[in-house]
Amino acid sequence: MSIYSDKQQSRVAVNPKTGEPYKTGKKVQEWLESSPEGVEYITLEESARIAEMNFAIRNHEYASVLLSDGDPEIVLRQSMYGVECQSKMDYLKPVGRQLIDHKTTQSLDTFPDWIERKYLFQMAFYRMMIKGITGHTWNVSLVAIEKEPPYEIGIWELTDDSLIEATADVIAQLQYYRYCRDKDIWPGKYPEVNRI
C-alpha cells in the first residue's frame, strides 16, 4: 500500500463526461461550491507530482518495505498523565512494531538538523501514545522525500537515546497542562514583561 495511493488521486476534480480534470470557469466554480465540505482539490500538475513521488517511494529499496503491510493515517486516543490526548500517525506497521512518519522537504541536506530541532518532541509523543495502548515500545522511522525531481528519499531511524530528552519534555508539558487546567491558571509562555 502506498502513502498516496488512490485516496490522494480521488481528490482530483475530474469531469465525468470527459474523464479529464476540470478547467477553471463558471461551471467549475458552480461545481466547487456544490462539492461536499472537506474535499480538497489539486491541480493536474500536483497530481502528476504526487504520482512521481509515489513511484519514487515504491521503487526505493527501503522506503517501499517500510511503507508496506501496515496501516496509514491511524488516529489514537488515550489519557496520558491525566490529559486526554489524540494523535494521527502516518503509518503503523504492526510487524516489527514500526511507527513510520512521512515528510516532504525541500532538501534532505538540512533534514537531520530539522529533526533535532522540531521533530523529536512529536515522535516522542507518538511513541508514548502507542506504548500506552499496546504496552510495547515501538521503533520510530522517518521517511522523507524531496518535493522536486529527482525526488531524493532519505530514511532515518530514531534511537531510544535520541528520544529520551524529548520524552521527558512531553511528560513535563502534559503535567504542566494538567496543572494549569486543574487550577484554571493559564499564564502562557511569557506572563511577565520582558526586557531586551
Regions found by a protein language model. Give the residues of each.
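Metal-dependent nuclease catalytic cores that hydrolyze phosphodiester bonds in DNA/RNA
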Residues: 1-88, 191-195
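Hydrophobic/aromatic-lined pockets within catalytic cores
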Residues: 3-4, 104-107, 131-134, 178
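Short histidine-centered catalytic/ligand-binding loop motif
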Residues: 38-42, 109-118, 159
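Secondary-structure boundary elements
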Residues: 62-68, 93-99, 130-138
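Coil-to-beta-strand transition motifs
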Residues: 82-86, 93-97, 137-138, 148-151
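Conserved catalytic cores of phosphodiester-cleaving nucleases, focusing on short active-site segments
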Residues: 87-112, 126
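Metal-dependent nuclease catalytic regions and adjoining charged, substrate-binding loops involved
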Residues: 115-117, 125-196
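Glycine- and acidic-residue-rich phosphate-binding/metal-coordinating active-site segment common to enzymes
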Residues: 122
